[in-house]
């Protein structure tokens, strides 16, 4: 159906007192926007015609249309000025094939398995918008997008909670995993085996956190597709949101798919202004900038601390820096309604993560482990390799208890390291020997005995916190006895 036929049908319906349906008006808006884009792109490629520029003037409304339809088209004119500016400016900077592709790309609705989910969420969005309109809430479409995002987050909250609890359980075992890595060094097979045994004994599945995330992906794809359908149908063309002129601007999904999603922002004109002017550009840039700031704040609050010794530490830091920038760049290429959804989703996700991780909302279910023993030391006293000495029944740990368990595990790791230093000190004592050589010279014998008696001085000067007291006392007593024996030998030799 052509645009003129659509206008004639609307005129006849309005004259008869029948208002066109929301879906029909959406198709009308989408067809008119596509036709405007085609005409402007074609005109900009004519060699004898100057490049079209954005104008604040609104095209005159045909006088034979009813007053209601004329007012609607008048309010729709602003968004088409944005489309005109984007198309005319981009046409001078890109190849003709790209312009033809952008002009001929008609809005398409989601298909395949996404279609039922997108259609259902779209109907919920319509119901929310109509309900807000009845309550005379301003910016009803913007608030309906936020409410729909909130509903989806609440529906997926159990899956999010399960994912967070699994991640916290794995994080609580990290000190013990680090001890395993220190014990086996570069033997990755042994590390993997011991780590698997630890997960099994602790009752933790490290892959359990992936399943809830995968389950929520189709839902959010459907939500994104439903908002895309609304934008393609033109239902957001006249819907602003506070400082944002239109939730359908400043670009379209068709232009984004053709690589012209940011043509509203650059290239800059001769006066240094973007194609749509600094005033509108600044208004549309507010949402992407807010989104980047919220992403950075969320990452700094909810992300676990990065271990400098981790081999993936640099990759994790790079993701924390570049991921918000990538999301901000993507929001520049989509209508403002989708940017509003990204912002609402980020804020709600951050609030849920803070509640679960910082405020005790998550319960970590795992077997409480006893003191740390040497993993991988083989079977000793009935304890197999990789097992830990004390086991308790499965308990439910709150966030505070999980933090306490993590601190106790770190203390156990420190005690194990001190035990390793103690073992090294004991080995040093074992290597020390008292050697006596009876020579013809009495002075040489006396000097050898003196060296033997003073052989324990460095060991006695060691830090008491690093050497077990009982081991130290036993070793020093042995040295004193050896020294006494050496002195007696010297006295006998002298006699």
UniProtKB/Swiss-Prot annotation:
GO terms for molecular function: membrane insertase activity. It is a multi-pass membrane protein. Its main location: plastid. Pfam families: 60KD_IMP. The chain crosses the membrane at residues 76-96, 207-227, 274-294, 318-338, 442-462. Residues 97-206, 295-317, 463-495 are stromal. The keyword Transmembrane helix applies. Residues 228-273, 339-441 are lumenal. GO terms for cellular component: chloroplast thylakoid membrane. It is found in: Plastid, Chloroplast thylakoid membrane. Disulfide bonds: none annotated. Keywords: Chloroplast, Membrane, Plastid, Thylakoid, Transit peptide, Transmembrane, Transmembrane helix. Associates with the LHCII complex and with the psaE subunit of the LHCI complex. Belongs to the OXA1/ALB3/YidC (TC 2.A.9.2) family. Required for the insertion of some light-harvesting complexes (LHC) proteins into the chloroplast thylakoid membrane. Essential for the assembly and activity of LHC I and II. Its function is probably partly distinct from that of ALB3.2. This is Inner membrane ALBINO3-like protein 1, chloroplastic. The lineage of its organism: Eukaryota, Viridiplantae, Chlorophyta, core chlorophytes, Chlorophyceae.
């Amino acid at each position: 159906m052509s645009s003129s036929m659509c206008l004639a049908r609307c005129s006849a319906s309005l004259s008869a007192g029948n208002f066109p349906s929301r879906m029909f008006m959406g198709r009308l808006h989408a067809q008119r926007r596509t036709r405007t884009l085609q005409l402007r792109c074609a005109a900009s490629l004519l060699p004898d015609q100057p490049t079209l520029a954005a104008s604040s003037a609104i095209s005159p409304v045909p006088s034979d249309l009813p007053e209601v339809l004329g007012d609607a088209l008048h309010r729709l004119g602003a968004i088409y000025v944005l489309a005109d500016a984007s198309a005319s400016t981009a046409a001078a900077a890109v190849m003709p094939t790209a312009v033809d592709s952008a002009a001929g790309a008609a809005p398409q609705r989601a298909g395949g398995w996404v279609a039922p989910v997108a259609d259902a969420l779209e109907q919920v969005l319509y119901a929310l918008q109509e309900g807000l309109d009845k309550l005379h809430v301003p910016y009803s479409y913007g608030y309906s997008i936020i409410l729909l995002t909130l509903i989806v987050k609440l529906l997926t909250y159990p899956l999010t909670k399960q994912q967070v609890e699994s991640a916290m359980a794995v994080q609580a075992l990290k000190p013990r995993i680090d001890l395993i890595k220190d014990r086996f060094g570069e033997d990755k097979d042994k590390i993997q085996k011991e780590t698997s045994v630890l997960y099994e004994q602790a009752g933790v599945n490290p892959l359990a956190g992936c399943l809830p995330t995968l389950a929520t992906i189709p839902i959010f794809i459907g939500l994104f597709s439903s908002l895309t359908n609304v934008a393609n149908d033109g239902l957001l063309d006249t819907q602003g949101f506070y400082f944002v002129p239109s939730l359908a601007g400043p670009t379209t999904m068709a232009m984004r798919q053709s690589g012209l999603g940011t043509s509203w922002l650059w290239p800059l004109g001769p006066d240094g202004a973007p194609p749509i002017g600094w005033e509108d550009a600044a208004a549309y840039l507010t949402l992407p900038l807010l989104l980047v700031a919220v992403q950075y704040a969320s990452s700094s609050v909810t992300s676990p601390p990065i271990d400098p010794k981790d081999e993936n530490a640099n990759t994790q830091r790079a993701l924390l820096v570049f991921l918000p920038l990538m999301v901000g760049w993507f929001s520049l290429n989509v209508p403002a309604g989708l940017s509003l959804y990204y912002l609402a989703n980020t804020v709600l996700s951050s609030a849920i993560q803070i509640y679960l991780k910082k405020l005790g909302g998550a319960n970590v279910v795992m077997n409480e482990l006893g003191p740390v023993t040497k993993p991988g030391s083989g079977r000793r006293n009935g304890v197999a390799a990789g097992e830990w000495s004390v086991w308790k029944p499965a308990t439910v740990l709150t966030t505070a208890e999980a933090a306490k368990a993590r601190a106790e595990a770190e203390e156990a790791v420190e005690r194990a390291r001190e035990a390793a230093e103690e073992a090294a000190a004991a080995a040093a004592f074992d290597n020390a020997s008292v050697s006596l050589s009876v020579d013809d010279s009495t002075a040489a014998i006396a000097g050898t005995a003196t060296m033997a008696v003073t052989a324990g001085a460095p060991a006695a000067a060691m830090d008491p916190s690093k050497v077990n007291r009982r081991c130290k006392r036993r070793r020093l007593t042995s040295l004193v006895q050896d020294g006494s024996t050496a002195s007696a030998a010297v006295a006998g030799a002298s006699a």
